[in-house]
Amino acid sequence: VANNLKLEDINLDDSPAEVGEEACDLGRRIPEWKKTLALVVAANYRCGAYTSYSNNGRTVVFVGEGEDSVVASCCFRASANAAENCFRTYCVRMKALGYGNVSRQKGVKGTWMLGFISGLKRAYAEQVSNDESMALAIVVPESVNRHMDGIGLRTTKIKVRTTSDPYVKADGYESGYGFGRGDRVTAASA
């Protein structure tokens, strides 16, 4: 739904499409908020997502029909980079206002990122509500659900360290909502 996709851009024929996986390398340590972001992006691009752990590092794997998994992976990378850039801008702004180095305070980054993800999720939901024909187009296909069930994944709880400051989450929310609506996000803006 993001990036102004139209119903004509999505293939709705009944022939069974091949389910594919696209891995996105995350390095050795995965911030918990990235797992949440991956799930939100995957749902918006007709995909499922899971995290894979190995000795070489961690990956998030997007599972979708056709090119859906590749598109979801690219969108995830762009969203994660935008979130990091916006958070850095937020930290610079808070330091200029005399709040010190907020990036080192416990829970601030997790809270801000959860706000960003909530804003992004709302922007995606608004795009669907503005064009109700898209609601059916972004439903995760049954073949993807069967593939995800067949993998035999263990579920774990995502635990993001947060702070109780509502202003931190609100700032992240506004940045995520703006990014989801297509506003240009750079390291200098936000």
Please name every model-derived segment.
Residues N4-A190:
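Extended, helix-rich structural scaffolds rather than catalytic motifs
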